[in-house]
């Protein structure tokens, strides 16, 4: 299947993301602690923890750091009572946006999230307003250069739902989120090194961004990601290579 890969769509944001690495690590550690506290320290029986571990490794976190975070969660050493909150809304150009948060103060979190939407011309919606457009799936991404048939055969044999190859040669393997870890292990065992692996919310439809709406969407995403309580931002905005070059 042809199209624009996440690889192409996010290249222009890499420098900005690198500058946020410290904040990204803090958020991943928070997710590791929470996942271990709620579901135990065994990633084999805790899909949420397994997803957090793979995200940590994709972001070059050391095993020592992530193991300490898991131990904190299992041991209950962190007494902060964090809860997962999902906010839904509409961004620039009619984009559907889901914001996943971990918070110990709902009032603070919703205020910060609403401010980001308002400042960028969007608006915070009600529960269910856009979530029906997204499906929770595992996504294992490979950089351009791998043989498509090799990846596809290994992925489908391992239980993947779909394999998508993009114009630039990048490949995404989509899995049921519950078996994400098993599929990732099978692909690793086949010698296929992933560029990233995570559980994500995949949109069923895309909203094309133009030169006017794309910068506004990027600003919304940046403002949300700058919020300490925000763990993930999912959206259905599609930015073409031509528009991305202008950002």
UniProtKB/Swiss-Prot annotation:
The keyword Nucleotide-binding does not apply. Pfam families: TACO1_YebC_N, Transcrip_reg. Disulfide bonds: none annotated. It is found in: Cytoplasm. One of its GO terms (cellular component) is cytosol. GO terms for biological process: regulation of DNA-templated transcription. PANTHER family: TRANSCRIPTIONAL REGULATORY PROTEIN YEBC-RELATED, TRANSLATIONAL ACTIVATOR OF CYTOCHROME C OXIDASE 1. NCBIfam families: PRK00110.1 (NF001030), PRK12378.1 (NF009044), YebC/PmpR family DNA-binding transcriptional regulator (TIGR01033). This is Probable transcriptional regulatory protein ECA2494. It comes from Pectobacterium atrosepticum (strain SCRI 1043 / ATCC BAA-672) (Erwinia carotovora subsp. atroseptica).
């Amino acid at each position: 299947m042809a199209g624009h890969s996440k690889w192409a769509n996010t290249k222009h944001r890499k420098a900005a993301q690198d500058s946020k690495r410290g904040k990204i690590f803090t958020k991943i550690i928070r997710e590791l602690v929470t996942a271990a506290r709620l579901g135990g320290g065994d990633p084999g029986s805790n899909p949420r923890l397994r997803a957090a571990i793979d995200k940590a490794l994709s972001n070059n976190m050391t095993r020592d750091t992530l193991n300490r975070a898991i131990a904190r969660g299992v041991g209950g050493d962190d007494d902060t009572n964090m809860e997962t909150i999902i906010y839904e809304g509409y961004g620039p150009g009619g984009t559907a946006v889901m914001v996943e948060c971990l918070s110990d103060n709902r009032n603070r979190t919703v205020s910060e999230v609403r401010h980001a939407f308002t400042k960028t011309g969007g608006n915070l919606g009600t529960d269910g307003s856009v979530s029906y457009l997204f499906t929770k799936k595992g996504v294992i991404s490979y950089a351009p250069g791998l043989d498509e048939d090799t990846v596809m055969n290994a992925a489908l044999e391992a239980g993947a739902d779909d394999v998508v190859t993009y114009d630039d040669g990048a490949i995404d393997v989509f899995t049921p989120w519950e078996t994400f870890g098993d599929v990732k292990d099978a692909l690793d065992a086949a010698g296929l090194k992933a560029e990233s692996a995570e559980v994500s919310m995949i949109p069923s439809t895309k909203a094309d961004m133009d030169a006017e709406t794309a910068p506004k969407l990027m600003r919304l995403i940046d403002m949300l990601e700058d919020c300490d309580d925000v763990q993930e931002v999912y959206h259905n905005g599609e930015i073409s290579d031509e528009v991305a070059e202008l950002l």
